[in-house]
């Protein structure tokens, strides 16, 4: 193989997602997931050139064993030799990183410094970087960090500050950071292409809807606000996260209900959202499939879409210019026609009129405009964060 490929690593605390992409064509050569780290059933599954495989990693296996298995067992010699750089998804870069960077000792320290804002993710990313250095020592200078928070660093102060004592921001960095930046960036850029608008002129509201969900207001190609905040807990209703709520509810849960801080955190992060509202599941497909026959399903989806529509409406105001499109992406955004329909029905005041046939067709990888002709545009665009990571890595390494 003469082409230069990029290995993409997305390390979680107990898992490792990986892929190998051609950054020019976008062709995916390998994808996979290693999971259940530190447990008796640690395992790995992958798809190489269209063929699937899986294996046990051994009890207690983690990032090191997974990466060693990838290098020694999954990769062919040709594929291994074609890897020219490694791209690392990093959840939090704090205020320091506004774009992707080649990983140096200084960058590693920066990721460590931001770990207090992402205590589950950033330490895992650092493990992934360390293991990548060991597995591919000849590529040490070709490792690149792509930050989830970077795209949102163009937010103005009035958008990222909380109305708390200013010292909390100055001394401790308490502010809005946002997440899903790579996805919001990708679909805003793709919207510009599809609508034949320059990337630095596009005005869109991007809705990344999945188990985690966020909205971003993008004016002239730059993010000016986003719904996730200091952590991914703020904003929209999500699979298991509450999103926005009155902070005094936390005091009530602690002082009156006797719940510990750990119990409250678990409730807000793991037991709320669609799971909390349905009392059945965090899977949006349940609510969509049972919307007409189960009150719990209807309740959950109505709250989800109402919250989403409120954010979209408020972002229309702050963009302050002609809005080119509302973009739906992510697992729910790309596939849940009913979510898009209910949400856009809330926005009829602004002229949005859904085309039922187009909306129903836009799923399972199909994309396109879902609103009626000669009405404001809403469009479904599948996200591809891996491609952004591959392209940024190639740009900084090749």
From Swiss-Prot:
Places the protein is found: Cytoplasm
Catalyzed reaction equations: acetate + ATP = acetyl phosphate + ADP
Organism of provenance: Histophilus somni (strain 129Pt)
Catalytic site positions: 148
Protein name: Acetate kinase
Taxonomic lineage: Bacteria, Pseudomonadati, Pseudomonadota, Gammaproteobacteria, Pasteurellales
Positions that bind substrate: 89
Main location: cytoplasm
Annotated ATP binding sites: 17, 208-212, 283-285, 331-335
GO (cellular component) term, any one: cytosol
Function noted in UniProt: Catalyzes the formation of acetyl phosphate from acetate and ATP. Can also catalyze the reverse reaction.
Cofactor note: Mg(2+). Can also accept Mn(2+).
GO biological process: one example: acetyl-CoA biosynthetic process
EC number per UniProt: 2.7.2.1
EC primary class: transferase
Molecular-function GO terms, alphabetical: acetate kinase activity; ATP binding; magnesium ion binding
């Amino acid at each position: 193989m003469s082409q230069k490929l990029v290995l993409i690593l997305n390390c979680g605390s107990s898992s490792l997602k990986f892929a190998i992409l051609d950054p020019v064509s976008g062709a995916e050569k390998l994808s996979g997931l290693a999971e259940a780290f530190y447990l008796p059933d640690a395992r790995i599954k992958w798809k190489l050139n269209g063929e699937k495989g899986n294996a046990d990693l051994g009890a207690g296996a983690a990032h090191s064993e997974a990466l060693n298995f990838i290098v020694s067992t999954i990769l062919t010699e040709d594929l291994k030799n074609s890897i020219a750089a490694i791209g690392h998804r990093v959840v939090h870069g704090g205020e320091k990183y506004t774009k992707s960077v080649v990983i140096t000792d200084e960058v590693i320290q920066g990721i460590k410094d931001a770990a207090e804002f992402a205590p589950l993710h950033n330490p895992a990313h650092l493990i992934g970087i360390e293991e990548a250095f060991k597995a591919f020592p000849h590529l040490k200078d070709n490792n690149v960090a792509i930050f989830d928070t970077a795209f949102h660093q163009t937010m103005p102060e009035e958008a990222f500050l909380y109305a708390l004592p200013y010292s909390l921001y100055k001394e401790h960095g308490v502010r809005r950071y946002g997440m899903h930046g790579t996805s919001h960036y990708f679909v805003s850029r793709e919207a510009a292409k599809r609508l034949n608008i320059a990337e630095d002129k596009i005005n869109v509201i991007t809705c990344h809807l999945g188990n985690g969900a966020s909205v971003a207001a993008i004016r002239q190609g730059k993010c000016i606000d986003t719904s996730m905040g200091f952590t991914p807990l703020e904003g929209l209703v999500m699979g298991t996260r509450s999103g926005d709520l009155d902070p005094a509810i936390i005091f009530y849960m602690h002082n009156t209900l006797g719940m510990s801080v750990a119990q409250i955190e678990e409730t807000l992060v793991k037991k709320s959202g669609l799971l909390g509202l349905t009392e059945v599941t965090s899977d949006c497909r349940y609510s969509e499939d049972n919307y007409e026959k189960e009150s719990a399903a209807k309740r959950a989806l109505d709250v989800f879409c109402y919250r989403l529509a409120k954010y979209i409406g408020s972002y229309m105001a702050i963009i302050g210019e002609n809005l080119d499109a509302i973009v739906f992406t992510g697992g729910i955004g790309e596939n849940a026609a009913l979510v898009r329909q209910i949400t856009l029905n809330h926005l009829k005041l602004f002229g949005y009129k859904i085309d039922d046939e187009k909306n129903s067709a836009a799923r399972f990888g199909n994309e396109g405009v879902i609103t009626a002709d000669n009405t404001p545009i809403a469009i479904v665009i599948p996200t591809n964060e891996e491609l952004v990571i591959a392209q940024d890595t190639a740009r900084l390494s090749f």
